[in-house]
Amino acid sequence: MIYKDGGKPGYFIPNFTIFGEGFPFNEMYINEHVFLLDLMDCGYNVFAYFYMQTPYIMNQLNSIGGKAAIPGINTKDVECLPIYSNESPYVKKFGEIVLPFIKTILSNSLENAKQAKVRDTLLPKLMSGELKINEIETEK
């Protein structure tokens, strides 16, 4: 996803995020401040995520997005950007190497959120004495 955060006339800095594996949610709804970039190939999406953040593409997006009174980009603007073919052996190899890492990062992010909920539930009870460590049964 490409999105704008803040900005003022003549000034546009795009931001990027990556999603998948249920992160941040299984279903999402977006508004006009978010541009969904899904190239229908997970490996190619990962390549595009990093490629879009290169100085060359960032300068292109800054230039395109900063021309309007309300900074931003549209579908036509993104479709005009140069990008390597998904058939390139280098792009395919990049996806093969990097995609497993991205999937692990996204999966770990979900696990971190679950663990934070458990911590936030248990810690106040432990601190107040409502729950004692020796009272907690553990699985063996």
Predicted segments with their positions:
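A short beta-sheet element
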Residues: 1-53, 64-79
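Amphipathic alpha-helical coiled-coil/heptad-repeat segments
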Residues: 42-43, 47, 58-60, 64-68, ...
